[in-house]
Amino acid sequence: MCGIVGYIGHREPSKIVIDGLRRLEYRGYDSAGIAVHHNQNGIDVTRAVGAVDKLDLLFSQKVTDEEARIAIGHTRWATHGVPAERNAHPHMSMRGTISLVHNGIIENYETLKKKLVSEGYEFKSDTDTEVLANWIEFHYHNIYSEGDHDLALAVRLALKDVVGAYAILVIDSHTQQIVAARKSSPLAIGIGSDEFVIASDATPIIEYTRDIVYLEDGQMAIIELHSQMNGGNPDVTFINLDNEVINPEIEHVDMELDQIEKGGFDTFMLKEIHEQSETVWNCLRGRLTDGEEPLMMGGVENVLPQLLRANKIFIIACGTSWHAGLIGKTMIETLTRVPVEVDYASEFRYRNPIIKPGDVVISISQSGETADTKAAM
């Protein structure tokens, strides 16, 4: 499950966004990225495969605009396209006008992409998110042809064409705004006295404010940073996709960070037990679609031929990952009739298993750092 963080206000935005992404690491990810709005110098994007610390290192090597006040960031689990820098968020539109981070799945992205290709658009990634960034830009430039940089209108028009689930943050190179919108994917707006922090959940927000709006489906937030002549502080307008102004409830969050991370439960175990149905749904939502490709195999395309030709599959893991492997064994054998063996990684590495040409070994590790599993591989 991906993570989103955005900031607009008087502090250094890149630090708040990167620190916020660290707070969301528990959600899991394979790559991370940040886009910073450099006032008159456009939008700068930094992306990295691997840990948020790697992103932080890459970003620290850049010369940044000390006057920047807007940034958006993202941690990604691959669904459309392999884990690679080109597929990481934020995505830029072809003309460099729009930058976007997105959680969810755009089910009709192929239809939108064909339309964009017919309009001369080219794509650098394998993702549905880049399609959405360009679809917003397509509307944005149609609006600008009439003399207006109306980012919120472009987002509204684009989303009316979208089928699927999304939580998005959008910035453009011409205005000092973040536009946020959601459908079937969580998004929280933290409201400070002179700043706003936007995130997938409250964990990156509560250090800066305890007043939070949780967007509902079909709602948008337009957060604009005013010029110094107009006070220099940001404000927010909440609307729906029909451009009707709404007044959502502002919740004051009293829970501490560890309580928020536990979702109100006493332990992480209870939280994870109660989240199972939602977690399974989120996993499937990124893999199963009604499009021309009903099964999305993002992250494993490079080894898909070997998987399809497998004579036998070995799954190695530890702890709860081992239990997940047992479920995988049942499903794989039922659906494919390929035999599967599930082993504890700590035993697999010592027992000299019989692995023949054409067999496939799959390791499972929630953290990616389980020592026995890495040693067994």
Regions found by a protein language model. Name each.
Residues 1-262, 266, 275, 281-311:
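Conserved short alpha-helical segments that host acidic/polar catalytic motifs at enzyme active sites
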